[in-house]
From Swiss-Prot:
Function: This protein is involved in the repair of mismatches in DNA. It is possible that it carries out the mismatch recognition step. This protein has a weak ATPase activity.
MF GO annotations: ATP binding; ATP-dependent DNA damage sensor activity; damaged DNA binding; mismatched DNA binding
Keywords, in A-Z order: ATP-binding, DNA damage, DNA repair, DNA-binding, Nucleotide-binding
HAMAP family named in the record: MutS
Pfam families: MutS_I, MutS_II, MutS_III, MutS_IV, MutS_V
Protein name per its UniProtKB record: DNA mismatch repair protein MutS
Family note: Belongs to the DNA mismatch repair MutS family.
An annotated GO BP: mismatch repair
Organism domain of life: Bacteria
Sites where the protein binds ATP: G600, P601, N602, M603, S604, G605, K606, S607
PANTHER family hit by this protein: DNA MISMATCH REPAIR PROTEIN MSH1, MITOCHONDRIAL, DNA MISMATCH REPAIR PROTEIN MUTS FAMILY MEMBER
Annotated GO CC locations: cytosol
Underlying gene: mutS
Amino acid sequence: MMEQYYEIKKQYPDAFLFYRVGDFYELFEEDAVKGAQILELTLTHRSNKTKNPIPMAGVPHMAVDTYVNTLVEKGYKVALCEQLEDPKKAKGMVKRGIIQLVTPGTMMSEGPNDAKDSNYLTSVVTTEKGFGVAYSDLSTGEVYATHLKSFEAVSNELLSLRTREVVYNGPLTEQNKEFMHKANITVSSPTPIEGEHAEISYVGQNLTNSAEKKATEQLVGYLLSTQKRSLAHLQVAKSYEVNQYLQMSHTVQNNLELVASAKTGKKMGSLFWVLDKTHTAMGGRLLKQWLARPLLNVDEINHREEMVQALFDGYFTRENAIDALKGVYDLERLTGRIAFGNVNARELLQLSRSLEAVPTILDALDQSDSDVLKEFAQKIDPLKGVAELITTTIVKDPPLLTTEGGLIREGVDKQLDRYRDAMNNGKKWLAQMEADERQKTGIENLKVGYNKVFGYYIQVSNGNKNKVPLDRYTRKQTLTNAERYITPELKEHENLILEAQTRSTDLEYDLFVRLREEVKKYIPALQKLGSQLAALDVFCGFASVAEQNNYCRPSFHTDNQDIDVVNGRHPVVEKVMTAGSYIPNSVEMDSSTNIYLITGPNMSGKSTYMRQMALIAIMAQVGSFVPADSADLPIFDQIFTRIGAADDLISGQSTFMVEMSEANDALQYATKRSLVLFDEIGRGTATYDGMALAGAIVKYLHDKVGAKAFFATHYHELTDLDETLDHLKNIHVGATEENGKLIFLHKILPGPADQSYGIHVAQLAGLPKSVLREATKLLKRLEAQGSEIAPASQQLDLFAQPEVNDSEEVQAEQAVITDTEQNILDDISNLYLADKTPLQIMQLVADWQKDLKDDK
């Protein structure tokens, strides 16, 4: 057996080999040692009596999926080696072979948290002109292809797709290997495929670009070689260009938190969290795809908005459709499992129940007053025949396994009914036969019996042998005092009774497979229906969100890049705040203004204001309504951001290098139709270097790029740029002081901020009083120095001993007042001495002293 194991293992050296032995899958050698550690299995040994016992660990075959998923989730591959013949019938060694190679990009099972996530396997081929890229989610059969000019563009696509595995046809540079490793992407080599396969030609039939075609052939070839079965559900590849959509790099999508919070990596806190009111897994996946690829075509956007508008206006239509959608399972992945051959009876019933919900959805749409909803409904095929086929074949509550019987309804197959009748009524039939034969023959002591050697028989005593009807009875066994006989009828029922269970189970499985193969004929229609219901689910969700959050339908213009958003709101921030407490802000940028230079204190809302604009643009071009009183927008072709201060762990770049790289992307690739968000450019380096770079970048954006840009800064010297840059406008986020406390107004106001309130924000953060006092002194000195930018040799040494007069130092120390100090000052101011005795005043002073000591 071990020779067979080693021979198979040789073919899959980079995978865990799960080797079927009876009711277990066994791991041997290094696989066992490593697998036992990862899967928390008991490590044993085979051939313990030898000098070199073989490490071994096993898992029950019934639970193998759980263990396989654990390994694959960690980035490993698993080769499933199955027994290919019945061990009882095998002559010699049981024949075994690999039935499937499970890899990170081909895993089809899912947990409760990833039903709305796609699992993409991506194929990349190098060509003379660049790269061909094709990717697929095996569980749904969708296939997409494109071509890119640089590996940087490929890397961005891989990150945006959240690809788990890449099939790459060439050697990777060390830098690219490092990228794949840090991005947690498994890299696999292409696998040669022998002979012609219909799937390869079918999937790539509409591709005209040679790079895309090669990438798709490599993709499908890898899937066929690893899955080792027909993949009839793979769809015709859809070719696309990245510039067909609003382009956003992976970094931009992360900065704007489109599908996950930047802090937690979870759904909560993202735009997806706000917009996801879908009730199907496929609707959730489609929404994520739309958020990553907003549209550029105004007609397509308007069509989506018309659907949302109709569902927004038609409350009962929407609610009836939603109620029906709640009963729809994941048609796309159910279809994939049907094609894959691992669907069970319960899942087929899920399919039929999903199809049974479609007529209700169609009725809701047909009864609406909206032509666009009626047109949408007319394109949907409810596939009634498929649902009926399943429900008339499968029992209402079938078992999970398809090999143990109990799947098929009565009346579906006459032979199966006879088997079941034999199983359920065998003893009753034998008793009845015994009574009938006694009556027919007149032999009162005739009996029907059974033994394991001869099976069922009719026993007649020697005294009654002359009454036996030999034309019907055949002698089977002679005893001392009796004879045993068999009849054709008894023999027939003997076979039914003894083999009914086995034959019934086998026949049920055969009937189930026939049903599955019949349903498989409808795969293209089921996939189309799934995509239609997914889109409807998203539209209903958009309408619900718009109603709940008081969104408006945006309008678009293509003759200029003017922005007019009245009382816009950040969709995520608004949701986590108390209802009605969010302070809205407008954006009015006509042809006279291309750049908003935004100043104001930290925490005042500068970043929120900028992100708000980007999210409104994305929501609008996805087809959603937007959080504003009104919005008239241009079509943006790209969004660039420089937000946040963090090192790029994947590329190994420092904070400042990341900052400059992201700024460079905008300066190099932004067009007049782009939206640019820059937050605190230059803070990753020395003050004057940063200020100089920030000023130069603003000027370049103004003079060379011409995009609509939001530029937040603490370099107040930059606000003077409005004197020389005609299309730059200063705005600031309002703040005020009350009783020494900083109050954020969160309102966008014209002109630059008069100060940044940095020390006040530090006070809110709880910095020690001594630090705040020292900062106040230093601020006084810097303000005394003046705002002119001096060369490095003349820049102020912050830590040199200054010449500060006593009055300035006192003013500096008094500038920072804690809450405790303010309360004491208020008590003194309100104290009426005539009402207090000397002892009471002494007690008050003692209390104040104690409070001041506790406050230090």
